[in-house]
Amino acid sequence: HRAYQRYLNKFSQAVNQRVFGNLFRWFFSELKFDNYTLDFDSTVMVREGSQEGAAKGYNPKRPGRLSHHPLLAFVSDVRIIAKYWLRPGNTSASTNYLSFLEDTLSKLEGKRVGLVRMDSGFFAKEILDYLEMKGLHYIIACRFNNRIKYSLTHERKWIELTDGLEISETIYQANGWEKPRRIVMVRQEIEKRPK
């Protein structure tokens, strides 16, 4: 027991990052698959007891409990975790998201990323600018602010995909953006398409 403990204590966070970074690079270089779809998200992991890095933060299922708030990246085509950063529970969704994105893409060096999908926690100018600079296609859920609501309620050209589900598009420029971007809007009738 103590021998294992002494051995494992030699691994610092920096050593873990270096070892597992190289391991991930090797693993993805060996995959004979290209044109990945990368999904990015964050989640809340409730903790029991006093685990290192756990802190009180946003926790919808068990408010007030200690938790971690990790960032995750998945290669959805083959259902593999591409990158995982464990963060304290009191970390906001957008903390270090750009560094996480850059680090994830560096581990997939030599592979083509055909599409990046992200939740609204990643909807920020820096992320959009970075993805566009890299020439990556992306779908990011946007935050539902008043200007988006206005566009949604005043849009008249909707395409019905199926009963109770319609899409439309508009051009939107948030404060601080140098240019407008295309926004695809989705609306669904809850009675016809419940969750």
Predicted stretch roles:
Residues H1-Y4, D34-M45, R79, V113-F123, ...:
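Short, conserved catalytic/metal-binding motifs centered on acidic residues
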